[in-house]
Amino acid sequence: MKLVIGTCTDGPVLVFDMETKSITEKLEGVSSPTWVEWEKKSKRLYVANEIEEGYVAVFEWDNGKFSLVDRFTIDGHSPTSLCVLENGSVLTANYNSASISRSKAKDEKPHVWHHEGKSLHPERQTSSHPHQVTAHKHLVCSVDLGLDRFSIFDAEDTSSDPVVVVNVPAGYGPRHIVFHKTLPVCYLICELANRILVYDTNTFECLQDVSTLPPSMTLEKDPKFPQPPSAAEVAVVHDGPFLVASNRYLNHGQCDSLWAARLDPVTGKVIEGTEMQIMLHGICPRHFMFNRGASLLAVAMQDDDLVHVYRREPKSMCLHLLFTIPAPKPTCVKFLEDEDLA
């Protein structure tokens, strides 16, 4: 098993071997490779390069190693996320150009959707800031932190306008969304409000609005530590089932946490009273990922220059730190199972 690590540095992308516990490859030809995505069918790793003139680098797995096989511009600035559709199209969320791009290869001119508007926050929401684009079944979803909304597209016709636009409360600053694998439910984590909104994906009615912060904590700024708490990533663990999210900049920068709660297996809603805070060994968990069986968890601790790898006990959120991986400003982690690479 491999663990791929993206960073907000000049590169490279790091490939860590989970068996030998060592960095086995450093993938060059990237700049600020903050997001990575694996496409299993083609055995290709797609890397979003979060620089002003953003681009995507593509690495192919062959004969036990990665090789750079493609690199194309996206006609957008600072892509923070990407997804690969079944037809080979690559979608990127371009944070600093208020746009979503669709590209296919270096010889194809990107198709770009531009967004306009603003919302409540005087610094973070003066314009559109798409933060994520992701695919689920026949849907493509883009999440816009600056406009306080997310949009749903038909994956078969991403050249058209969105089929659904969902507005969230002003000032919430939505960041990432994750869809339940078997239930018609999705979970939207909001960076600025430190809250998760639960939606019915048939109607996109909001079912719940849940805080990820400890009960005693507020969003008021501390003059000694001006960085306010900000939520980052969200995921579903299906053997609980649990909903898990990461909190950044708690406790005056001393120690951050994962928030977790049990989900109702029938409705997919958060079960009130099951919320827990799991303290981590560091600060700024910008991204995390469970492996396919959810027995392992990797957490990118951006401000500590470390990735933490935990063992998770079955059907619980009890975590045991196994080891740490030095990595400069890690921003994204991606497990690649042996069967993915075979």
Curated annotation (Swiss-Prot):
This is Uncharacterized protein C18E5.01. Pfam families: Lactonase. Residues 104-126 have a biased composition (Basic and acidic residues). Belongs to the cycloisomerase 2 family. Gene3D superfamilies: YVTN repeat-like/Quinoprotein amine dehydrogenase. One of its GO terms (molecular function) is 6-phosphogluconolactonase activity. InterPro entries: Cycloisomerase_2, Haem_d1_sf, Lactonase_7-beta_prop, WD40/YVTN_repeat-like_dom_sf. One of its GO terms (cellular component) is cytosol. Coiled coil: none annotated. PANTHER family: 6-PHOSPHOGLUCONOLACTONASE (PTHR30344:SF1), 6-PHOSPHOGLUCONOLACTONASE-RELATED (PTHR30344). Residues 102-129 are annotated as: Disordered.
